[in-house]
Amino acid sequence: IFMKKPFYFLLTKSIGAYINLLSFIFPAKAIQMAHGYFSEPRKGKFTIDKLPKTLKEAISETIIHNDDIIQTYIWKGNENVVLLIHGWESNSSRWKKMLPYLKKSGCTIVAIDGPAQGLSTGKEFTVPKYAEFIDIVAQKYQPNYIIGHSMGGKTSLYYQYKYQNPRVQKMIILGAPSDFTIILNNFTRMLSLNNKVRKTLKNKY
């Protein structure tokens, strides 16, 4: 652990220094690289042969939308539908401890793997892209309730703001960041990105 910290520090600062240098020569490429490091999850994916036990108990369904494959899991119940939205570097298996309690409600439960997470395709996990996934899933399963955790909670709020789904009666938001700027600032500080890159990234989000 002691050796990992200096290595991680040097790695992040080296990446940041390279992006800063690149921003003066190829600014568009520098922003693309910074955006990639910020939005690409490093964990949360798995393959079908490594499907968590919790998800094996569900009905697995995929939705194809444009070039995306959206993975969903359904636990059948009554006509009321609860849609579960996980957070950053996660997947639908994160609900395993909550599922037994939700099943007692009798509702049909639908969980979604976000972009570049679980079995869903993609390389980037962003709020607008995730909200688009939610909208496609919501059109098919017509949820009455949405439960979102962390970035999934923030995305749930953004989804309802943008798409105005009249069928959604209630939303439960768990541990969602109150200010996305804080997350972005932490990222730019970690890499010591220059003001030029910082401002462009902020405008992008």
Question: Which residues are covered by each model-predicted region?
Answer:
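Conserved alpha/beta-hydrolase
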Residues: S92, L99-T121
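Alpha/beta-hydrolase active-site loop
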Residues: G122-Y145
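An N-terminal hydrophobic leader/cap segment in hydrolases
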Residues: K5-T62
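Active-site glycine-rich loops that stabilize anionic/oxyanionic intermediates
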Residues: E79, H86-S90
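Conserved alpha/beta-hydrolase fold motif
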Residues: Y145-I147, M171
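Short beta-strand-to-loop junctions in surface cap/lid or active-site-entrance loops
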Residues: I70-N80
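The alpha/beta-hydrolase serine catalytic core
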Residues: V168-Y205
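Gly/Ala-rich beta-loop-alpha elbow adjacent to hydrolase catalytic centers
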Residues: I147-S156
